[in-house]
Regions:
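Short acidic/glycine- and proline-prone juxtamembrane loop motifs at membrane-interface regions
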Residues: 1-7
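Membrane-interface transmembrane helices that cradle and orient dolichyl/undecaprenyl
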Residues: 15-30, 135-139
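Membrane-interfacial loop-to-transmembrane alpha-helix junctions, especially the N-terminal start
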Residues: 30, 67, 138-150, 196
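Helical-face signature of the major facilitator-like transporter fold
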Residues: 31, 35-39
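Transmembrane-helix signature of polytopic, lipid-linked glycan biosynthesis machinery
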Residues: 149-167
Length: 200
């Protein structure tokens, strides 16, 4: 885990808490707090854009509600200084990620990606998580968001590895929803609880 991952994990956790509150009750302050948490995520690391994207597509009906646009306005206002800096410096970060890092297809990058993810997430958790993912269905909007973020990050960066090297920690934000879902899956399954206590 690199330094930017620490605030990313922290504000990612805050975001999920506030998103839960927002889905349960949409009002002015929940929208403002959600917007602030998204801005703080974006300032932490650009992978946060993916997190928010996967959450949004997991709940497209949310886009019909006015308060989600208030959250978007709050985020946009807080991101103005960052946008101004990029305009003044010819968008160096976007140039680096979208142009400079692009390479020709090399199978070794994809083959590196898979074992690296086992190292990040622990194979004793990742493999059972994938099994449970297919055996269980989400029960509410919050769990649906966890599904989309967990799977979305792993699939997105697997595809990204087809055009360049993917650092192992780029998917670390998915550990938050992944662990929450894993614990949700096993809470009524004694055999899985025994596995966790014994192996994990």
């Amino acid at each position: 885990i690199t330094t930017p991952d620490v605030p990313l994990l922290f504000f990612g956790t805050v975001f999920f808490i506030l998103y839960k509150k927002f889905t349960e009750k949409q009002n002015f302050w929940n929208a403002v707090l959600l917007g602030i948490s998204v801005a703080l995520l974006f300032y932490s690391k650009y992978q946060a854009v993916l997190l928010v994207f996967f959450v949004v597509i997991s709940n497209l009906k949310m886009l019909t509600k006015p308060y989600i646009y208030l959250a978007g306005i709050v985020t946009s206002l807080l991101m103005i200084p960052h946008l101004m800096w990029h305009i003044e410096h010819d968008f160096p970060t976007f140039q680096y990620h979208l142009v400079d890092r692009s390479e020709k297809f090399k199978i070794k990058y994809f083959l590196e990606y898979l074992p690296n993810q086992f190292a990040v997430f622990n194979p004793f958790i990742l493999i059972p998580f994938v099994i449970l993912l297919f055996k269980n269905k989400y029960q509410n909007l919050q769990e649906k968001a966890y599904y989309f973020v967990s799977v979305g990050f792993l699939v997105f960066f697997a595809l990204t590895s087809l055009r360049g090297h993917v650092e192992p920690h780029w998917t670390v934000i998915a550990s938050i929803p992944m662990m929450i879902l894993f614990l949700q899956f096993i809470k009524e399954k004694p055999s899985w609880q025994k596995y966790v206590r014994t192996i994990v």
